[in-house]
Amino acid sequence: IKKNLFKFFFKYAHKIIVNSSHFKKEFQNVFNINTVLIYNPLDKSQILKKSKKFLNFKFFDDSKSLKIINIARFTNQKDHITLLKGFELIVKKKKCKLLIMGYGKNKEIIKNFIRQKKLNNYINVIDFQDNPYNYLNKADIFVLTSKFEGLPNVLLEAQVLKKFIISSDCPTGPKEILKNGKYGDLFNVGDYKNLSKKIIRYNKNLKVNRSKINLAYNNLKR
Protein backbone atom coordinates (compact mmCIF):
# COMPACT_ATOMS: atom_id res chain seq x y z
CA ILE A 1 0.00 0.00 0.00
CA LYS A 2 2.78 2.41 0.98
CA LYS A 3 4.63 1.74 -2.27
CA ASN A 4 1.54 2.54 -4.36
CA LEU A 5 0.83 5.62 -2.26
CA PHE A 6 4.37 6.90 -2.78
CA LYS A 7 4.15 6.28 -6.53
CA PHE A 8 0.87 8.20 -6.66
CA PHE A 9 2.38 11.29 -5.03
CA PHE A 10 5.73 11.06 -6.82
CA LYS A 11 4.09 11.43 -10.25
CA TYR A 12 3.07 14.98 -9.32
CA ALA A 13 6.62 16.01 -8.44
CA HIS A 14 8.63 18.02 -10.97
CA LYS A 15 11.88 16.78 -9.46
CA ILE A 16 12.81 14.41 -6.63
CA ILE A 17 16.01 15.14 -4.74
CA VAL A 18 17.87 12.53 -2.68
CA ASN A 19 21.00 12.92 -0.53
CA SER A 20 22.80 9.62 -1.16
CA SER A 21 23.65 7.25 -4.00
CA HIS A 22 21.87 4.46 -2.13
CA PHE A 23 18.55 6.33 -2.19
CA LYS A 24 19.05 7.21 -5.85
CA LYS A 25 19.40 3.50 -6.67
CA GLU A 26 16.45 2.61 -4.44
CA PHE A 27 14.14 5.05 -6.21
CA GLN A 28 15.26 3.68 -9.57
CA ASN A 29 14.84 0.02 -8.55
CA VAL A 30 11.65 0.27 -6.48
CA PHE A 31 9.75 3.08 -8.19
CA ASN A 32 11.52 3.29 -11.57
CA ILE A 33 12.03 7.01 -10.96
CA ASN A 34 15.11 9.05 -11.85
CA THR A 35 16.18 11.39 -9.07
CA VAL A 36 18.69 14.19 -8.59
CA LEU A 37 21.50 13.50 -6.12
CA ILE A 38 22.44 16.53 -4.01
CA TYR A 39 24.53 15.90 -0.92
CA ASN A 40 23.80 17.77 2.30
CA PRO A 41 25.74 21.06 2.42
CA LEU A 42 29.01 21.04 4.37
CA ASP A 43 30.66 24.30 5.43
CA LYS A 44 34.28 23.16 5.76
CA SER A 45 35.67 26.61 6.55
CA GLN A 46 33.26 27.08 9.47
CA ILE A 47 33.97 23.59 10.82
CA LEU A 48 37.73 24.25 10.72
CA LYS A 49 37.33 27.71 12.27
CA LYS A 50 35.17 26.44 15.14
CA SER A 51 37.45 23.45 15.74
CA LYS A 52 40.34 25.81 16.58
CA LYS A 53 38.48 27.74 19.28
CA PHE A 54 39.95 27.37 22.76
CA LEU A 55 38.50 24.51 24.81
CA ASN A 56 39.27 23.81 28.44
CA PHE A 57 38.43 20.10 28.56
CA LYS A 58 40.78 18.20 30.84
CA PHE A 59 39.16 14.81 30.15
CA PHE A 60 41.02 14.65 26.81
CA ASP A 61 44.28 16.19 28.07
CA ASP A 62 46.07 12.87 28.72
CA SER A 63 48.47 12.57 25.77
CA LYS A 64 49.09 8.88 26.49
CA SER A 65 45.44 7.86 26.14
CA LEU A 66 43.69 7.00 22.88
CA LYS A 67 40.84 9.48 22.62
CA ILE A 68 37.55 8.28 21.14
CA ILE A 69 34.43 10.36 20.50
CA ASN A 70 30.82 9.67 19.58
CA ILE A 71 28.35 12.45 18.77
CA ALA A 72 24.76 11.25 18.39
CA ARG A 73 21.27 11.50 19.83
CA PHE A 74 20.69 9.19 22.81
CA THR A 75 18.17 6.92 21.06
CA ASN A 76 17.87 3.21 20.25
CA GLN A 77 18.73 3.98 16.62
CA LYS A 78 22.23 5.15 17.60
CA ASP A 79 22.90 1.91 19.54
CA HIS A 80 25.16 3.30 22.26
CA ILE A 81 25.11 -0.07 24.05
CA THR A 82 27.22 -1.56 21.25
CA LEU A 83 29.66 1.33 21.69
CA LEU A 84 29.81 0.82 25.46
CA LYS A 85 30.21 -2.96 25.24
CA GLY A 86 33.03 -2.53 22.73
CA PHE A 87 34.73 0.09 24.87
CA GLU A 88 34.48 -2.12 27.96
CA LEU A 89 36.63 -4.71 26.16
CA ILE A 90 39.18 -2.07 25.12
CA VAL A 91 39.72 -0.62 28.61
CA LYS A 92 41.08 -3.98 29.76
CA LYS A 93 43.81 -3.87 27.09
CA LYS A 94 44.51 -0.23 26.27
CA LYS A 95 44.73 3.18 27.91
CA CYS A 96 41.85 5.13 26.40
CA LYS A 97 39.07 7.65 27.00
CA LEU A 98 35.61 7.88 25.45
CA LEU A 99 33.54 11.04 25.12
CA ILE A 100 29.85 10.61 24.30
CA MET A 101 28.04 13.80 23.30
CA GLY A 102 24.34 14.09 22.55
CA TYR A 103 20.82 14.39 23.92
CA GLY A 104 17.74 12.19 24.20
CA LYS A 105 15.64 9.76 26.19
CA ASN A 106 18.36 7.09 26.58
CA LYS A 107 20.81 9.26 28.50
CA GLU A 108 20.13 7.57 31.86
CA ILE A 109 20.35 4.10 30.29
CA ILE A 110 23.81 5.00 29.00
CA LYS A 111 24.92 6.45 32.34
CA ASN A 112 23.57 3.46 34.27
CA PHE A 113 25.54 1.06 32.05
CA ILE A 114 28.70 3.08 32.70
CA ARG A 115 28.12 2.99 36.47
CA GLN A 116 27.33 -0.73 36.54
CA LYS A 117 30.48 -1.57 34.58
CA LYS A 118 32.58 0.84 36.69
CA LEU A 119 33.71 2.80 33.62
CA ASN A 120 33.21 6.29 35.11
CA ASN A 121 36.93 7.10 34.98
CA TYR A 122 37.12 6.28 31.27
CA ILE A 123 33.85 7.60 29.82
CA ASN A 124 32.39 11.10 29.92
CA VAL A 125 28.79 11.74 28.83
CA ILE A 126 27.91 15.36 28.05
CA ASP A 127 25.00 17.19 26.46
CA PHE A 128 25.26 18.34 22.87
CA GLN A 129 27.36 21.51 22.56
CA ASP A 130 26.82 24.61 20.42
CA ASN A 131 30.33 24.00 19.13
CA PRO A 132 31.04 20.26 18.98
CA TYR A 133 33.99 20.72 16.63
CA ASN A 134 36.62 21.72 19.18
CA TYR A 135 35.74 18.57 21.13
CA LEU A 136 35.91 16.47 17.97
CA ASN A 137 39.23 18.06 17.10
CA LYS A 138 40.79 16.72 20.32
CA ALA A 139 39.86 13.11 19.51
CA ASP A 140 41.84 10.48 17.61
CA ILE A 141 38.91 8.32 16.50
CA PHE A 142 35.26 9.02 15.72
CA VAL A 143 32.95 6.03 16.23
CA LEU A 144 29.42 5.64 14.87
CA THR A 145 27.37 2.62 16.00
CA SER A 146 23.98 3.37 14.43
CA LYS A 147 21.50 0.68 13.39
CA PHE A 148 20.39 2.83 10.44
CA GLU A 149 21.04 6.31 9.04
CA GLY A 150 20.24 8.58 6.10
CA LEU A 151 23.56 10.11 5.16
CA PRO A 152 25.25 10.93 8.50
CA ASN A 153 26.75 14.41 8.22
CA VAL A 154 28.78 13.82 11.38
CA LEU A 155 31.02 11.40 9.44
CA LEU A 156 31.71 14.08 6.85
CA GLU A 157 32.48 16.58 9.62
CA ALA A 158 34.92 14.11 11.16
CA GLN A 159 36.60 13.77 7.75
CA VAL A 160 36.98 17.55 7.50
CA LEU A 161 38.90 17.47 10.81
CA LYS A 162 40.98 14.48 9.63
CA LYS A 163 39.73 12.04 12.24
CA PHE A 164 39.91 8.30 11.74
CA ILE A 165 36.40 6.88 11.47
CA ILE A 166 35.11 3.50 12.60
CA SER A 167 31.45 3.04 11.72
CA SER A 168 28.76 0.40 11.69
CA ASP A 169 27.97 -0.74 8.16
CA CYS A 170 24.35 0.27 8.60
CA PRO A 171 21.85 1.27 5.97
CA THR A 172 22.48 3.87 4.64
CA GLY A 173 25.40 6.23 4.29
CA PRO A 174 28.51 5.00 6.13
CA LYS A 175 29.59 2.60 3.39
CA GLU A 176 29.13 5.35 0.79
CA ILE A 177 30.99 7.98 2.84
CA LEU A 178 33.82 5.59 3.74
CA LYS A 179 34.03 4.14 0.20
CA ASN A 180 33.58 0.53 1.35
CA GLY A 181 36.37 0.88 3.90
CA LYS A 182 38.89 2.84 1.82
CA TYR A 183 38.37 5.98 3.92
CA GLY A 184 37.82 4.34 7.32
CA ASP A 185 36.79 1.06 8.96
CA LEU A 186 33.39 -0.63 8.91
CA PHE A 187 31.93 -3.29 11.21
CA ASN A 188 28.61 -5.14 11.21
CA VAL A 189 25.77 -3.52 13.14
CA GLY A 190 25.86 -4.62 16.78
CA ASP A 191 29.21 -6.42 16.51
CA TYR A 192 30.88 -4.82 19.54
CA LYS A 193 33.69 -7.40 19.58
CA ASN A 194 34.82 -6.47 16.08
CA LEU A 195 34.45 -2.79 16.94
CA SER A 196 36.79 -3.24 19.91
CA LYS A 197 39.34 -5.09 17.76
CA LYS A 198 39.38 -2.27 15.19
CA ILE A 199 39.95 0.34 17.90
CA ILE A 200 42.70 -1.73 19.54
CA ARG A 201 44.44 -2.12 16.15
CA TYR A 202 44.38 1.64 15.50
CA ASN A 203 47.93 2.36 16.73
CA LYS A 204 49.31 -0.79 15.10
CA ASN A 205 48.07 0.37 11.70
CA LEU A 206 48.87 4.09 11.97
CA LYS A 207 50.45 4.36 8.52
CA VAL A 208 47.46 2.72 6.82
CA ASN A 209 44.98 4.68 8.93
CA ARG A 210 46.65 8.01 8.14
CA SER A 211 46.49 7.12 4.47
CA LYS A 212 42.73 6.47 4.81
CA ILE A 213 42.28 9.79 6.64
CA ASN A 214 44.11 11.71 3.90
CA LEU A 215 42.22 9.93 1.12
CA ALA A 216 38.93 10.83 2.80
CA TYR A 217 39.93 14.46 3.25
CA ASN A 218 41.25 14.87 -0.29
CA ASN A 219 38.08 13.41 -1.77
CA LEU A 220 35.60 15.54 0.16
CA LYS A 221 33.54 17.14 -2.59
CA ARG A 222 30.61 18.46 -0.62
Residue ranges, per PLM feature:
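Membrane-interface segments of envelope glycosyltransferases acting on lipid-linked substrates or membrane lipids
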Residues: 1-222
